[in-house]
């Protein structure tokens, strides 16, 4: 036997081994012989415990099996009783069925006996049975969604009830039977009728629910409508209203189910509800409009019923019920008149507009269209909605009806339904979506321009900006700061026409130009300008995407002024912030001398220049602000660029294989066709716009220009004050003004005199160069101009700067002369001549700021690289020049009149030559008012001049526009020996700088370089001349002079004449 306990299992091997040796006696004997008593007792106790465990296990096993056996017996007895009961029931059913089959079945039972009492009792019983069977019948109809059948059964039960009530009300009949006593045999009749009457509300409710169940066929909705019309006694107008209200509920359910978080989901909901509207209008036509001679489906359904004799089966002699039913049908037919087409159209139009208001109105407190956040998404949504409107598949349920009406297949079902039902040339898009989409586009424009205002924070940028480190910085350190700008401005963007397929890729020259702009503006200004441009570009892209529609024309008229006004308002707000910061800096400059904790002037100037660069960037190098404010016709370029990108991606797709013919429905061809169609719609609308710039653009340009000048005015005032202080200090420390001997840099001039038929020569010494501090004064001013942008600065800024400097010079010399008259030492004759030359030279160089200039405002174009200025100047003497003349007159009075008459023409000639030699060095000022253009330039004979002589070669006065073409292909190119000539040039320059004089030694050595340079200039300008008109020659000449002026920053004063010969006219 098995042992379940652990102890028994432990000694199992011992027991087995004992039993295997033989009988129990031998085992016991061997055990006593081999084992001690302690182990024998252990084995005994283990064996006894094992025996008890086995007994208990056997006892539990037998008890469980017995209980199972008893339960099984009880189950068997119960099963037997159930089987007997089932058998008895089956036998009873079988007998009943046999008894039913043996009885005669008739619609109206025929009684063998004509006993009136029995006939009346039988008739009443059959009618009561009809009422009793009615609930079950109606339930079955409702379960099968046969609502019209259920309504008919209810109405017939009502007629039977009316018949019974009539019997109950009469006291006797033909057979003198008390009918009331007979009805007393059916006490549940009243209760039964209450049950039947409750089905009226159920039929109506289930029918309404059926109408709210989408996705069913038209027959199901017709059945529900007719059931409601019968039960609730509605006329056709009310039925139409009920049908339209149920569809409105459909639309509300779809709208409320949309979360409004995803634009794609919103567009799909719009398409779904639009499909509901189209299908509903089509079904209204099929249900209520009579087309040709065929009756509408609703009337056909509600008025077509089987004969009344077949509706009251089981009731003997139902003549009165039939009469009641016929009267009911007559009344129904009198009510169910076919609606007039105009009434149906008005109801549908009213319903359609209400649905449209719900679609674009607020749903759960927000507009679903707000989920669409870009103009491109609006355009895509419109495309999908229009595709849904024109889809034939949406109205597939009405195609058979349309075919029966028109006699053939209909290609545009919605257009035909619109003609039949609405009776108006109604466009669903215009009626529902157009206004909402336009308003949403305006909201998108508003939000993006609001983001522009938030993204470009002028105040924070100005407060954080400073290129100067340290608490205090003096003016000399400011002048010695490293230069970061200037030379890049000789590069102009290359504006080439881009092909349609090539896209809008920028050329390397354009990229270089943009990098130069970024280097000049700095990262802060570039980021702010790019932020403005990016957002304006985004707005314009959205707008153009929205214009790719059939409604492009009306949208352009509405949105073009709107976006221009918004752009103007946003940029004006930005400029207002700039103006506010400039006012703050102006106030800070005034407080600088009074407050020890004031902002250092150098930092104030840097911040004002920072705003000046920002305004310059927005005025001249913003691409999309002038594009938006310009004529909408210019927006075509953006449209074509966007389409070219799409076409490029289309062309990069794999083509069809050669053995596969491209069909008209191929995706690639279809996409290409759609793009062309959309582009043509947008471009046609844009080209139809007026070709005029918004007046706000000119106003905005004037504002930016004025603010740019205002920003540089702080720089002009501060720099003029500091430079004039240096000039005054140098002027006061100039001891040469009291010298009686010729000063350094003077030239001897030979004056021929005729006396008594003989000529004598008189040598006079006159200054040929301005004073070093005057040249330094003008050089530092030019260098500062070069630092902040060079010749790209607005002309009016340079004029103001020149005028301010000339005013300061005038004041300095007036005060200086007044002080010298009252103190020692007095100014000598030589000093007077030097001052006269200095004043005349400074007045000529700065004369551009002392003129009245009428500047024609340039017309803004989309290409800022081709920005040209045309000026018609009318120059008149103003106050500064008059004051200079007064100082000059005061100085000449210190000279002997006869001597002054001798000196004057030669002194002014020296000044003219000095002006011409320094024209390149001071080109920023000279370009404002170029003087002495008819004066021949001469080389200086001053022994201290460090100008290297160069071989004189013939050169052209003007660009060779009409000169014979000199092809570079037929001309041998002259190679320039760079190494030898460069070395000789350096040696020559070194000799001059060391004081060695060499007038002619290098002329022959460098003659080859002159010839090569002449050939290069002729060859390189021929192509330029071939593409320039005569009117452009002067512009090019002025620009080249302005560009060459930059080289003056790296040349000494005396070397200015080296390059001036390339930009000034020589007299032959």
From Swiss-Prot:
Main localization, broad class: Golgi
Superkingdom per UniProt: Eukaryota
InterPro entries: COG1 (IPR033370)
Subcellular location as annotated: Golgi apparatus membrane
Keyword Hydrolase: no
Membrane topology: Peripheral membrane protein
An annotated GO BP: intra-Golgi vesicle-mediated transport
GO cellular component: Golgi membrane; Golgi transport complex; plastid
Record keywords: Golgi apparatus, Membrane, Protein transport, Transport
Stretch list, region Disordered: 1-31
PANTHER family according to UniProt: CONSERVED OLIGOMERIC GOLGI COMPLEX SUBUNIT 1
Subunit structure as annotated in this protein's UniProt entry: Component of the conserved oligomeric Golgi complex which is composed of eight different subunits and is required for normal Golgi morphology and localization. Interacts with COG3 and COG8.
Function in brief: Required for normal Golgi function.
Family in the record: Belongs to the COG1 family.
Record's protein name: Conserved oligomeric Golgi complex subunit 1
Organism: Arabidopsis thaliana
Taxonomic placement: Eukaryota, Viridiplantae, Streptophyta, Embryophyta, Tracheophyta
Gene behind this protein: COG1
């Amino acid at each position: 036997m098995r042992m379940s306990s652990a102890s028994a299992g432990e000694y199992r091997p011992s027991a087995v081994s004992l039993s295997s040796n033989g009988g129990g006696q031998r085992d016991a004997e061997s055990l006593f012989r081999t084992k001690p008593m302690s182990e024998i007792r252990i084995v005994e106790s283990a064996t006894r415990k094992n025996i008890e465990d086995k007994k208990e296990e056997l006892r539990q096993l037998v008890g469980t099996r017995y209980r199972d056996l008893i339960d099984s017996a009880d189950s068997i007895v119960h099963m037997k009783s159930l089987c007997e009961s089932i058998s008895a029931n089956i036998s009873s059913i079988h007998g009943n069925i046999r008894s039913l089959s043996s009885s005669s079945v008739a619609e109206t039972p025929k009684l063998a006996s004509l006993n009136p009492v029995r006939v009346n009792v039988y008739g009443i019983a059959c009618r009561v049975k009809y009422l009793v069977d009615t609930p079950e019948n109606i339930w079955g109809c409702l379960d099968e969604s046969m609502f019209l059948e259920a309504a008919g059964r209810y109405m017939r039960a009502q007629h039977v009830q009316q018949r019974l009530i009539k019997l109950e009300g009469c006291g006797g009949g033909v057979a003198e039977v008390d009918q009331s006593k007979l009805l007393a045999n059916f006490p549940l009749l009243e209760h039964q009728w209450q049950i039947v009457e409750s089905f009226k509300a159920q039929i109506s409710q289930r029918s309404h629910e059926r109408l709210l169940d989408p996705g069913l066929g038209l027959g199901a909705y017709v059945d529900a409508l007719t059931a409601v019309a019968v039960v609730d006694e509605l006329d056709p107008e009310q039925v139409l209203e009920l049908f339209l209200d149920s569809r409105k509920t459909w639309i509300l359910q779809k709208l409320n189910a949309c979360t409004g978080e995803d634009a794609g989901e919103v567009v799909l909901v719009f398409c779904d509800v639009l499909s509901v509207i189209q299908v509903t209008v089509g079904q209204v036509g099929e249900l209520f409009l009579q087309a040709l001679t065929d009756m509408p489906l609703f009337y056909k359904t509600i008025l077509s019923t089987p004969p009344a004799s077949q509706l009251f089966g089981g009731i003997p002699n139902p003549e009165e019920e039939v009469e009641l039913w016929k009267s009911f049908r007559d009344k129904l037919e009198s009510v169910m008149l076919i609606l007039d087409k105009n009434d149906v159209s008005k109801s549908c139009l009213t319903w359609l507009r209400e649905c449209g208001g719900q679609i674009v109105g607020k749903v759960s407190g927000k507009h679903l269209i707000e989920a669409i956040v870009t103009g491109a998404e609006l355009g895509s949504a419109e495309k999908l909605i229009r595709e849904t409107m024109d889809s034939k598949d949406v109205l597939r349920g009405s195609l058979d009806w349309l075919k029966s009406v028109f006699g053939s297949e209909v290609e545009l079902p919605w257009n035909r339904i619109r003609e039949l039902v609405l009776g108006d040339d109604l466009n669903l898009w215009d009626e529902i979506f157009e206004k909402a989409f336009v308003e949403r586009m305006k909201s998108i424009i508003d939000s993006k321009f609001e983001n522009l205002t938030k993204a470009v924070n002028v105040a924070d940028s100005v407060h954080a900006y400073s290129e100067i480190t340290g608490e205090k910085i003096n003016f000399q350190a400011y002048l010695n700061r490293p230069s970061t700008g200037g030379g890049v401005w000789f590069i102009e963007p290359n504006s080439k026409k881009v092909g349609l397929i090539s896209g809008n890729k920028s050329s390397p020259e354009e990229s270089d130009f943009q990098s130069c702009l970024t280097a000049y503006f700095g990262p802060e200004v570039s980021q702010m300008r790019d932020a403005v441009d990016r957002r304006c570009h985004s707005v314009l892209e959205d707008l153009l995407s929205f214009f790719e529609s059939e409604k492009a024309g009306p949208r352009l008229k509405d949105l073009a002024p709107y976006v221009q006004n918004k752009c103007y308002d946003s940029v004006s707000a930005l400029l207002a912030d700039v103006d506010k910061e400039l006012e703050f800096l102006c106030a800070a400059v005034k407080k600088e001398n009074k407050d020890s904790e004031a902002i250092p002037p150098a930092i104030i100037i840097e911040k004002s220049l920072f705003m000046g660069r920002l305004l310059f960037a927005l005025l001249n190098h913003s691409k999309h602000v002038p594009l938006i404010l310009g004529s909408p016709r210019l927006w075509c370029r953006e449209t074509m660029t966007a389409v070219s990108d799409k076409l490029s991606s289309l062309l990069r797709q794999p083509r069809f294989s050669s053995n596969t013919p491209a069909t008209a429905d191929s995706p690639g061809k279809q996409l290409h066709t759609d793009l062309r169609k959309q582009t043509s719609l947008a471009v046609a609308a844009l080209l139809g716009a007026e070709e005029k710039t918004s007046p706000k653009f000119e106003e905005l340009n004037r504002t930016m220009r004025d603010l740019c000048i205002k920003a540089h005015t702080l720089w002009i005032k501060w720099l003029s004050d500091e430079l004039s202080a240096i000039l005054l200090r140098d002027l006061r420390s100039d001891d040469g003004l009291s010298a009686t001997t010729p000063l350094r840099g003077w030239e001897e001039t030979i004056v021929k005199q005729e006396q008594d038929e003989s000529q004598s020569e008189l040598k006079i010494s006159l200054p040929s160069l301005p004073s070093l501090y005057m040249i330094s004064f003008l050089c530092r001013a030019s260098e500062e101009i070069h630092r902040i942008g060079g010749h790209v600065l607005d002309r009016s800024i340079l004029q103001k700067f020149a005028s301010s400097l000339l005013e300061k010079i005038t004041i300095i010399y007036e005060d200086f002369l007044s002080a010298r008259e009252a103190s020692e030492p007095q100014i000598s004759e030589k000093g007077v001549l030097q001052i006269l030359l200095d004043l005349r030279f400074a007045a000529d160089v700065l004369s551009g700021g002392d003129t009245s200039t009428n500047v024609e405002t340039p017309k803004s174009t989309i290409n800022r690289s081709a920005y040209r200025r045309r000026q018609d100047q009318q120059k008149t003497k103003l106050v500064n020049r008059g004051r200079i003349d007064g100082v000059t007159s005061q100085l000449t009075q210190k000279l002997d009149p006869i001597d002054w008459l001798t000196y004057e023409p030669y002194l002014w000639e020296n000044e003219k030559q000095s002006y011409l030699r320094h024209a390149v060095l001071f080109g920023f000022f000279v370009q404002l008012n170029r003087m002495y253009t008819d004066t021949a330039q001469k080389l200086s004979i001053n022994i201290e001049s460090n100008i290297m002589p160069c071989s004189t070669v013939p050169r052209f006065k003007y660009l060779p526009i009409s000169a014979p073409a000199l092809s570079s292909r037929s001309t041998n190119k002259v190679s320039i020996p760079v190494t030898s000539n460069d070395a000789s040039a350096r040696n020559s320059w070194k000799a001059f700088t060391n004081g060695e004089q060499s007038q002619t030694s290098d002329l022959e050595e460098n003659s080859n370089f002159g010839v090569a340079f002449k050939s290069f200039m002729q060859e390189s300008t021929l192509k330029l001349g071939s593409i320039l008109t005569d009117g452009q020659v002067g512009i090019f000449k002025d620009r080249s002079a302005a560009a060459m002026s930059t080289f003056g920053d790296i040349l000494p004063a005396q070397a200015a004449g080296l390059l001036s010969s390339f930009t000034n006219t020589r007299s032959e």
